[in-house]
């Protein structure tokens, strides 16, 4: 069978394996690459290649992550797998690996375990939109009723955290048997790949989303007006369009009268580009770093939100001591720090370095935010934590 060459035209989807320690996440990752390479072409990756995950830094936090790639006939997948539970927590909170969908691995021999629940909750908090279940080690369970029971438990757990438990694809398989080349179990890996293709919708590309540019710098150019610079995070801004300036102060409207990149004039700025945007009638002192330029009505400023945060351990250069309620650090959003106060969950007195925790934050100035926005927690310019907006309150 001839191997197809990698087509850049295929939609690109980001996924990852999540689930309890030793339920077979890494074995499944190896099995997917192996079976799909054999079936559709591409590179197989061995278990020990994946298990030996390199360390990366995201927002000053060290995370071990393995990245593999595989293809189905219709899509190209980038897949992340983490060796340790702490790596998952950090990865999901920092958004180091944005997932369009996740494969939840549950050993049929054990059923749902504490980290199964924690990973589903994290998925909900950080905005993983779709979860597919792979019931692993099914070759070791002879009793059909037991499999039914485990499947039911997993579906109920998903529903508890507002995932559609009843409609979630659940594939029963054995990653190890598939990896060993047993055709009956290889077929289950193909079934999983087909579920990825059909159940996870094609992600909306950044360029198709509403325009947003976090402002990094502001200049005034005599005779031409005020220019803001930054990297377009999403969408497109065209010359002549109205834009809003959102965050820190009251929202104002203005018009984009020019876009330039590397001193050349353009008619638009697109997602991923570093541009200068010329604004009509806006004075230099009415706009500042930390605000965003956005398509009118697409994003609102907020001060209060629920978040999921990871507090760096001492070894990661974080705090050496716990903090308590009333803690007032800076919250770094996109390009600027804003001071905020925290409220800890009922019954939690203190937070230790290395913990992950849900907390309610109230900022002293509003920031343009949506659910899923990432931030760093800093003290005097040094990062002590990372977080994600789980729910906007006010």
UniProtKB/Swiss-Prot annotation:
The keyword rRNA-binding does not apply. Residues 19-26 are annotated as: G1. It holds the Pfam family GTP_EFTU. Residues 136-139 are annotated as: G4. Residues 10-204 form the tr-type G domain. Residues 81-84 are annotated as: G3. It is an enzyme of class 3 (hydrolase). Transmembrane segments: none annotated. Residues 60-64 are annotated as: G2. One of its GO terms (molecular function) is translation elongation factor activity. Mg(2+) binds at residue 26. Gene3D superfamilies: P-loop containing nucleotide triphosphate hydrolases (3.40.50.300), Translation factors (2.40.30.10). Residues 174-176 are annotated as: G5. GTP binds at residues 19-26, 81-85, 136-139. Keywords: Cytoplasm, Elongation factor, GTP-binding, Hydrolase, Magnesium, Metal-binding, Nucleotide-binding, Protein biosynthesis. GTP hydrolase that promotes the GTP-dependent binding of aminoacyl-tRNA to the A-site of ribosomes during protein biosynthesis. Monomer. This is Elongation factor Tu 2. It comes from Photorhabdus laumondii subsp. laumondii (strain DSM 15139 / CIP 105565 / TT01).
């Amino acid at each position: 069978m001839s191997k197809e060459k990698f087509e850049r035209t295929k939609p690109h989807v980001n996924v990852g394996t999540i689930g309890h320690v030793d339920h077979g996440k890494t074995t499944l990752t190896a099995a997917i690459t192996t079976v799909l390479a054999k079936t559709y072409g591409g590179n197989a990756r061995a278990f020990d290649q994946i298990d030996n995950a390199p360390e990366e830094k995201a927002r000053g936090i060290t995370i071990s992550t393995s990245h593999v790639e595989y293809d189905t006939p219709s899509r190209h997948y980038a897949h992340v797998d983490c060796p340790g539970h702490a790596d998952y927590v950090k990865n999901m909170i920092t958004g180091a690996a944005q997932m369009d969908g996740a494969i939840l691995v549950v050993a049929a021999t054990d059923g749902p375990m504490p980290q199964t629940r924690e990973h589903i909750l994290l998925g909900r908090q950080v905005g993983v939109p779709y979860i597919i279940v792979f019931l692993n080690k099914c070759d070791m369970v002879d009793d059909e009723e037991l499999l039914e029971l485990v499947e039911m438990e997993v579906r109920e757990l998903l529903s508890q955290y507002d995932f559609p438990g009843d409609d979630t694809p659940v594939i029963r398989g054995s990653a190890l048997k598939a990896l060993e080349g047993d055709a009956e179990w290889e077929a289950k890996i193909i079934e999983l790949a087909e579920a990825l293709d059909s159940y996870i919708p094609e992600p909306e590309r950044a360029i198709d989303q509403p325009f947003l540019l976090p402002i990094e710098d502001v200049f005034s150019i005599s005779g031409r007006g005020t220019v803001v610079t930054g990297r377009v995070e999403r969408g497109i801004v065209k010359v002549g369009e109205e834009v809003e300036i959102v965050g820190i102060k009251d929202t104002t409207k203005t018009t984009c009268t020019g876009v330039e990149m590397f001193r050349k004039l353009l008619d638009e700025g697109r997602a991923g580009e570093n541009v200068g945007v010329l604004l009509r009638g806006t004075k230099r002192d009415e706009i500042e770093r930390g605000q965003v330029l956005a398509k009118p009505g697409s994003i609102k400023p907020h001060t209060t939100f629920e978040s999921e945060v990871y507090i760096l351990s001492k070894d990661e250069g974080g705090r050496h001591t716990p903090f308590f309620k009333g803690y007032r650090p800076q919250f770094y959003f996109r390009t600027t720090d804003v001071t905020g106060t925290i409220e800890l969950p009922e019954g939690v007195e203190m937070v230790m370095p290395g913990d992950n925790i849900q907390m309610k934050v109230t900022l002293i100035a509003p920031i343009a935010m949506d659910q899923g926005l990432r931030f760093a927690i800093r003290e005097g310019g040094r990062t002590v934590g990372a977080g994600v907006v789980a729910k906007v309150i006010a």
